[in-house]
Amino acid sequence: MKGIHLKKAHITDVRKIHNLINLYAQKNLLLPRSLSEIYDHLRDFWICKEKETDELVGTCALGICWEDLAEVRSLAVLERYQRKGIGAGLVKRCIEEAEELGIKRIFTLTYIPDYFERFGFRRISKSMLPHKVWADCIKCSKFPDCDEIAMILKL
């Protein structure tokens, strides 16, 4: 990740995070996020910026669901920056943060299960996840016919 800076998101990053996530939401690859949601959950977000241009090139969030459960969500990397380790850096940092917080399990809903298997996530039935996690699904254009794959990582 040469020339890339990974850090916690700042209030000035919200609109850029919003634009990046919704770029992929328009392609039905991520759930859309409103500005209000991103402001409400700003502390969940990690970002990667290009050092020279300060361009936001990637983001990912660790959403806390319960005392022992968190979600890796809203992973997005600009296409021209993919396959450079940026997404991996973001996911690893979310995993590290979960460990620091004492969280025992992290899940994700994804279209790229092979990618998350690299970090130790394994496929599970969606029915194994608590009902609380499905609140966001109402915003999905594919609801109620979810085609994402549920995965979990035990820490």
Predicted regions and their residues:
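A short, internal acetyl-CoA/4′-phosphopantetheine-binding micro-motif in the GNAT/acyltransferase core
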Residues: L75-Q82, Y111-I112
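Conserved active-site alpha-helix within GNAT-family acetyltransferase domains
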Residues: K104, T110-D136
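A short beta-loop-alpha structural element at the N-terminal edge
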Residues: G3-I17
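A conserved beta-strand-loop-helix scaffold within acyl/acetyltransferase catalytic domains
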Residues: P32-F45, G58-L69, S74-L75
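C-terminal "cap" of GNAT-fold acetyltransferases
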Residues: L129-L155
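Glycine-rich acetyl-CoA-binding "A-motif" of GNAT/NAT acetyltransferases
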Residues: E52-G58
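Helix-loop element at the rim of GNAT/NAT acetyltransferase active sites that forms part
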Residues: K8, N19-P32
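Conserved acetyl-CoA-binding loop-helix of GNAT-fold acetyltransferases
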Residues: R83-E96, T108
